Amino acid sequence: MKFPADSNLILIMPGHARYRDPKTFEMSPALVRVRAPYFWRNTLAFIVVGSIPLGVYAYTWSFLNKDEFSDIPIPPVSDEELAKLKKEYANKK
């Protein structure tokens, strides 16, 4: 089925694409008007939902930053064993 080149058939465009400019994909004034009442509500929801993982991250960072790991004993390493480990490490690079 062929259509004339100058026809503007909305039927061949998906439903959501009718509210965008087919050349630039910018929102049409109708889409801007429809989305306007939800802008501040969506912004607030984004801030609330986004602050939860950021709060967990900040709490974890502050909690782990206080830990000194002084209660973990470090096994003694002799100079020969340290030289051997350094040589192994250099060979792996």
Curated annotation (Swiss-Prot):
Protein location: Mitochondrion inner membrane
GO terms classed as biological process: mitochondrial cytochrome c oxidase assembly
Membrane side Mitochondrial matrix: residue ranges: 1-43
Transmembrane segments: 44-64
Mitochondrial intermembrane side: 65-93
Protein name: Cytochrome c oxidase assembly factor 3, mitochondrial
Family: Belongs to the COA3 family.
Subunit structure: Component of 250-400 kDa complexes called cytochrome oxidase assembly intermediates or COA complexes.
Organism: Meyerozyma guilliermondii (strain ATCC 6260 / CBS 566 / DSM 6381 / JCM 1539 / NBRC 10279 / NRRL Y-324)
Keyword Isomerase (UniProt): no
PANTHER family: CYTOCHROME C OXIDASE ASSEMBLY FACTOR 3 HOMOLOG, MITOCHONDRIAL, CYTOCHROME C OXIDASE ASSEMBLY FACTOR 3, MITOCHONDRIAL
